[in-house]
Amino acid sequence: MTAEPEVRTLREVVLDQLGTAESRAYKMWLPPLTNPVPLNELIARDRRQPLRFALGIMDEPRRHLQDVWGVDVSGAGGNIGIGGAPQTGKSTLLQTMVMSAAATHSPRNVQFYCIDLGGGGLIYLENLPHVGGVANRSEPDKVNRVVAEMQAVMRQRETTFKEHRVGSIGMYRQLRDDPSQPVASDPYGDVFLIIDGWPGFVGEFPDLEGQVQDLAAQGLAFGVHVIISTPRWTELKSRVRDYLGTKIEFRLGDVNETQIDRITREIPANRPGRAVSMEKHHLMIGVPRFDGVHSADNLVEAITAGVTQIASQHTEQAPPVRVLPERIHLHELDPNPPGPESDYRTRWEIPIGLRETDLTPAHCHMHTNPHLLIFGAAKSGKTTIAHAIARAICARNSPQQVRFMLADYRSGLLDAVPDTHLLGAGAINRNSASLDEAVQALAVNLKKRLPPTDLTTAQLRSRSWWSGFDVVLLVDDWHMIVGAAGGMPPMAPLAPLLPAAADIGLHIIVTCQMSQAYKATMDKFVGAAFGSGAPTMFLSGEKQEFPSSEFKVKRRPPGQAFLVSPDGKEVIQAPYIEPPEEVFAAPPSAG
């Protein structure tokens, strides 16, 4: 039995033949920008070039074209501002940008340092070899260090450009790629500071706003870029906003705030990822995934897989963000102190902490500014710091060069000063009667050192009219001493001598409870030292405990201080020294 031949109508035959034609009818309308394109497809379709990052699809209706869109950060557009209402896709754009750069550049050429005060999405990029660190609002010290590192890179580049006569960042990039050039040793390429959530940044870190402005204004010339996202453009002051040469705008809460064009009102609501470019064209930002899926579903898993994929292709790593240690021992801060054979100036350069700005030691110049004040709440580290600084002074000076007198009512400074470095009589005072007697005797001896009126400048500088050791009066818990004085001003005999302290070899180191510190700066003794510009450490405390228009006291981890000195204001981690071992008496034997 034979099969019957298929019967087809003329219409069916003609339609089949037309469907195989090579030329097709002109499509009047391109498909709407609905679904995001994955990053692997964007990169495959993009025109690759250095410092260009593929970010999405741009619709150009006049050219009847939908093509890959990206940013070129090699020139004036290297700083980027991203504006848009909440949940419009700003953080996803930042993820896409970093992943796009990481997929097309080496960790030697681009590095990212992120401050995430938005939705927390940047933390998923932390394991990229191109990311030197991600800090959030729960890590204020790290936030400060991220900005400080960027400033340090810019300052170092500025010095390098001058030293090696580099005329532009473009020339620097070429020289850095040449292994025979000195600048090839620079571990940083083009570095990007990303701040996701600008209002939160200026609200919680107001002191850093000016530093970010400096980076935005000067950084591009040295390969340092700033990328900022904000829900409202008005949150960005003009002195920052004007330096953001590239702007990307999502749907705004108020279209009148647009920095590009009012066509942003045409962005559909509830369509995350839709934006407008500087060219005034509509965009669909891509998704940071490499699995070919045109969706933002399960994005965390896709990002994690992409990060792992990129990390497996590189052995280099962006320089990590260095942070202040929770504790720095004195022997780490001051491993090789100069000895007694050094000159006076060297011996009285005393290390008092590690700077947050560049992680180098901060010093108290006690040869010219002989005093040090330490204010802080209970358990903030006041006594430990005083102990460590006393040890640093003793390491530099022999007993013939310095002697200590202690006011130590709580016996917190046991073993802080070796017996050889203590004054002979009245060296350790644990009550008011003992202290008053010792201070009066000390004042009598120091008055003999006051300079005669006919000394020359050279004689004043060399202190040739007297000989002997400097005296350090180390006072722990000033507030307790004041309370025990019964209304009498403690240290009154020494107060008139403080203006001449540098001339007569007198140094005072005072610790005080933060709640009493402001009051202490008003008295004739501590107040005289504070008023003369003595370096002052503000450890942990409450803002209202020390009102000031120049800085804000706040809670800090033990040993961390805000240092106010003639050199400026900065955060330091003060030195730590192990407390003396407690010796317990053996229990009496039975019988």
Swiss-Prot record:
GO-annotated cellular components: cytoplasm; peptidoglycan-based cell wall; plasma membrane
Pfam families linked: FtsK_SpoIIIE
SUPFAM superfamilies recorded: P-loop containing nucleoside triphosphate hydrolases
Binding-site list for ATP: 84-91, 376-383
Domain (FtsK): residue spans on this chain: 65-259, 359-545
UniProt-recorded Gene Ontology molecular function terms: ATP binding; ATP hydrolysis activity; DNA binding
Assigned keywords, A-Z: ATP-binding, Cytoplasm, Nucleotide-binding, Repeat
Compartment list: Cytoplasm
PANTHER family: SPORULATION PROTEIN RELATED (PTHR22683), TYPE VII SECRETION SYSTEM PROTEIN ESSC (PTHR22683:SF1)
Domain remark from Swiss-Prot or TrEMBL: The C-terminus (residues 252-747) interacts with EsxB, the whole protein is required for interaction with EccCa1.
Subunit structure: Part of the ESX-1 / type VII secretion system (T7SS), which is composed of cytosolic and membrane components. The ESX-1 membrane complex is composed of EccB1, EccCa1, EccCb1, EccD1 and EccE1. Interacts with EccCa1, EspK and the C-terminus of EsxB. Residues 1-261 interact with EsxB and an artificial EsxB-EsxA heterodimer.
Function: Part of the ESX-1 specialized secretion system, which delivers several virulence factors to host cells during infection, including the key virulence factors EsxA (ESAT-6) and EsxB (CFP-10). EccCb1 may link the cytosolic components of the system with the membrane components.
Name of this protein: ESX-1 secretion system protein EccCb1
Gene that encodes it: eccCb1
